[in-house]
Amino acid sequence: MKKSLFLLGVAVAALTSCTNNEVMEVAENRAIGFSSFVGNTTKAATEFTGSATSADIYVIGYYGENGGELNQPVFKNELGSTLYYWNEGKDYIFGAYADGKGGKFDGVSFDPTNSKLTFTNYTPSTKDLVAAVSDKVENVTAASQGAVSLSFKHMLAQVGFTFNTQVGQEYTLAISNIQIEKAIKKATGTYTKSGDAIAWDGSATGEGEASYAYTDIADLANGTTNSNSEYNLIIPQAVSGIQVTFTASISGVGIDPAKTRKITVPLPTTSVSKWTAGYKYNYTTTINAEDITDELKPIQFTVEEIPTWEEGGNTDLDVPAIQP
């Protein structure tokens, strides 16, 4: 029987580059505006990409005297499309985020002194959380101040599972109750502009408690030879101690009633020891009937011999002469 899943590969998100650059429209010349850069990630869950508008991001900002402390609030966890106006000669700094395109997150705070955003007690769903902190905007000239540049980073990782089978399509092989257990599903995360540092702190769920759940696969043996579950957005964390559980069930010709087995597999750490923000990971395994029950024996074939070709001789052909 299969004892472990095998990590096939990692798709790396291009966090230091972007494919889209959109300048947010500003209603008036002196209004504070933003331009956004969002790093790429491979398609899977509902992702936030570079095609953004100011109505998609939320902003927290502070300003103060030139060279002094930035302690006066502006943009109090409000949409980037909200209109505020530059104060002549002041310094500004902004923190921004987007929880996918799913709206405001109330548990966010921004430390202007350390250029750090904090997301308290955050639980991923299907939304791609991205965060950014601007450079300090110093000694503003209100009439000519340009848009504030924001380069967003992905705060979460993505993890998916691929199930394969060699079972014939006369059978129904269902995979259900796919879930990650003993992983962190609720945590406090920080993004610090210096070094683009992302950190998360939280406690793992217990044995038998779902940290992240995946969609059931109705029939793996449907003639396509494999079926992929969707990816989930997940808190970045160490992989050690985390496991995946699922229920495999097979029915069909000669199998009455259906055979079912709940399978638990610790995630290997040989190739990947932690899930990093902005990266996508895939685990794959093969499930056949013998992994579900030992009551079934597959039909197998032994090729005893394929005979060699015998020589039948070589015969010359005479070409007829040309007739006059």
How would you name each of these model-derived features?
Residues K2-P324:
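Sec-type signal peptide cleavage vicinity
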